[in-house]
Amino acid sequence: MNLDFLFYPQSVAVIGASNKEGKIGNAIMKNLINFGFKGKIYPVNVKEEKILGIKAYKSVLEIPENVDVAVISIPGKFVPQTLEECGQKGVKGVVVISAGFKEAGNVELEEKLLEVARKWNIRIVGPNCLGVTNIENGFDCTFNPPERQARPEFGGIAFMSQSGAFGAAILDWAARHEVGMSKFISLGNMADLDESDFMEYLKDDKATRVITAYLEGVKDGRKFLEVARNATKKKPVVILKSGRTEAGAKAAASHTGSLAGSYTIYQAAFEQTGVLEARSMRQLFNYAKALTMQKPAKGDRVAIVTNGGGAGVMMSDGVLEVGLKMADLSEETKEKFAKAIVEGKLPAHMSYKNPIDIIGDAPSRRYEVAMRYALEDENVDVLAVIALFQSPALDEGIVEAVGRMQEYGKPVVFIAPGGAYPCLLYTSPSPRD
């Protein structure tokens, strides 16, 4: 599915544009102007001659040139007729910010909206949504002002949200935690385009490395299963699913009209399709940020290298608790460790079972030997490296040593528990293929 016309438009009409501070149509105009959108902006307002210094039109039909996308922010009862005019104009995509449809019990109005859209072959985002953002080209037709909601820098994470307010909080959080994003979609009621449509588009989007979502429910279960299964073959998909309890499901129904369904069914669907489920906002972006830096593991076998026995034990518990396996090191790898001990490269009283405990006086060069042996083992899919910097023996060379492990093409997770000292050494690596 190609939705480039929604994210890379050459022109946009803002229907309901306003000069009045505090109005949604005013905020949308300012965001399009201030965040660097290079296309043409056509404000539509029946009363004003100009909006923020730009010539205004009384109807989208009066605009003399082509319009790729229209953003509608007017009372809901007027939206179907306005959409009819968009169809006559040849508009390809419409973002309906307006509320008062299915989520408010007005099912017939939403059905009328969809009827008009199908008549003219228009694709709709919403209604009852915050808007969409393409951070790559500055196309931001959301309505939250930057002094209230920061915008993240361009990066590899796409995020779609069934809650506009939660989506805004995510964007703000991502900006303040330096998490780069490619695109943001507020799904709203999903009268037309739904989570599966956008997932299908994003799986082929070159700017997106990881697809993330906040979902209360899916529109079409069979469609979601098929699309998610195909999407996860190309790039990671991480979903924060709400409505997990009976109370949450009821709240979802009143929020967007979503049928949250049985949470156990969703869990099974995620497992079958390879979707990674997050349980909190922080977890969602921790997963996503990690997955933009390195490719997913090819298997579930984890090796641990540590300079602290207790930390290795706790990590072993964690590996099994999340459904992964502790790797069984091959005989060849064990022989490498034994030989290195004889040669004095590794201490005699270390353990080269998994976890690989290189003991508390380990410098970075000892870590490098152990990490290489583990990553060269075909039985190891993921390496977890625990570095307790409280030991004076551990030098800052460990940071560069861990970075060199990327040559093996396997995910490496670096854990440095404790205080501020590791933060002074750590610099975030650039995303790599």
State each model region's role:
Residues 1-428, 432:
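Catalytic-core regions of core metabolic enzymes
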